[in-house]
């Protein structure tokens, strides 16, 4: 079942989430601040759902920061919200809408 996006947004607005070690290292490598993640979630939309992910049910959210930086954020479902990874989508892997994966 896809997550309730409003509930996810509430967790992020209240800073009631964790970053996995992987997400934390990726955010540092990619110079993505927590505030930017929160901004992107607040305006974002779920573009992929992973109900059977090996780390537990999660989804991929696409959103923009206030500076218009596009981010993809994979996050687990509530009640224990964790960011699994975060990145700027690449035009090599994503269509121009940033929602659709390119197929090889």
Predicted regions: what is each one?
Residues 1-104:
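Ribonuclease/tRNase effector modules and their secretory precursors
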